[in-house]
């Protein structure tokens, strides 16, 4: 998303920020529901991107469609998006998805207590999303089931819950959305996007590190320090053990993939891990 759509999303996120301290998962579910309505109606998408309609008309149209069906906050957020300028119909859907996910992430962030393991609600959410994707990656049968176009959303949601039964309510909302309404991409890729939004919320990136064998605590600390220095910021590091990996180590940060063959960037990390 770029240009006018990016500006509209930034404006919407800024407006949403005022609602986040008291927002609940219900608001997120309502926004995801409105997203489903937009995605399922080509006529509505055309109306929302029709250059001959002004912003007030588009906003009023959406408020009329959702009025009485969702909360006032959800209607306000959706109406505000509709009244903004978008380069494409896809962009307004992506924006709704981002706002809904941001609400879920904020609910996790606002949890006052930490879990028994000592991690925050936001960290718990990230870990739960990562665990789901690992569970899917480990089973070709599950991957086929989640991508089966004839399977119902309810069946896919039930399967997801069986894969990771102990996840937080926040993670459950995002995972359910990803498997029932992936919007043309793999469910696991959408879960990754949600995890990236969660990491961005706490001003960190996610580094998925694949290694041939488990790291010791010392090696993990060195890896964390090396990656932080390499990127100039604190990263959230997830470790994936893959005995079949060629090269010893593979690091992915966002869309950037670094293999051990990139000696100029990972050579120092390899030396640190060998120490």
Curated annotation (Swiss-Prot):
GO cellular component: plasma membrane; proton-transporting ATP synthase complex
Cystine crosslinks: none
Coiled-coil stretches noted in the UniProt entry, renumbered to this chain: none
Compartments where found: Cell membrane
Keywords for this protein: ATP synthesis, Cell membrane, CF(1), Hydrogen ion transport, Ion transport, Membrane, Transport
Gene Ontology MF: a single term: proton-transporting ATP synthase activity, rotational mechanism
Pfam family membership, one: OSCP
Membrane topology per record: Peripheral membrane protein
Family membership: Belongs to the ATPase delta chain family.
HAMAP family: ATP_synth_delta_bact
Subunit: F-type ATPases have 2 components, F(1) - the catalytic core - and F(0) - the membrane proton channel. F(1) has five subunits: alpha(3), beta(3), gamma(1), delta(1), epsilon(1). F(0) has three main subunits: a(1), b(2) and c(10-14). The alpha and beta chains form an alternating ring which encloses part of the gamma chain. F(1) is attached to F(0) by a central stalk formed by the gamma and epsilon chains, while a peripheral stalk is formed by the delta and b chains.
Role description: F(1)F(0) ATP synthase produces ATP from ADP in the presence of a proton or sodium gradient. F-type ATPases consist of two structural domains, F(1) containing the extramembraneous catalytic core and F(0) containing the membrane proton channel, linked together by a central stalk and a peripheral stalk. During catalysis, ATP synthesis in the catalytic domain of F(1) is coupled via a rotary mechanism of the central stalk subunits to proton translocation.
Descriptive protein name: ATP synthase subunit delta
Species assigned in the record: Pseudarthrobacter chlorophenolicus (strain ATCC 700700 / DSM 12829 / CIP 107037 / JCM 12360 / KCTC 9906 / NCIMB 13794 / A6)
Gene: atpH
